[in-house]
Amino acid sequence: LWQEHDLTQNAVDLIAADQVPESGWKHVLEGLDEDGRTIALVHEDSPALRRMAVFDAIVNNADRKGDHILSLTDGHRHGVDHGLTFHRDHKLRTVLWGWRGDALTADEEDGIDRVSEGLHGDLGRELAGLLSAEEIASLAARCDRLRQAGRFPGPSGEMPAVPWPLF
């Protein structure tokens, strides 16, 4: 699937820390640039990115970088993934931490339920040819934990929370 992305739109960005917009964006972290200025990692506060963050939590994405999100002119966001997912051990590293602790929406809960239920049917059979039984069990457990919590997860503190480089 080839898609032309809109280079004028950035779903994730590094900006001056004192320039973080009050709405429409989520603050993730702050750091220093090469000149010692304080900068902030931010991402847009959009339903498309929320869905991607839920997906990343379910599949245990270990490498969601800013440039792994392609912004299309119609507002759609494509996630670029390359297989650092579905590990049985906790590996979630992402630039999409802006919703940590926020309640999941009914649509997000429904999506998690569909994945969880699908693991007992066609989705489970399909994944059985691609993942180990342990990886599928871990996927099911992540769905259950996320659904029970009803909130976006936050960093575990056990490992780096963001991939490096960020983009």
What are these regions (language model features)?
Residues 1-167:
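Phosphate/dinucleotide-binding and metal-coordinating scaffold of catalytic cores
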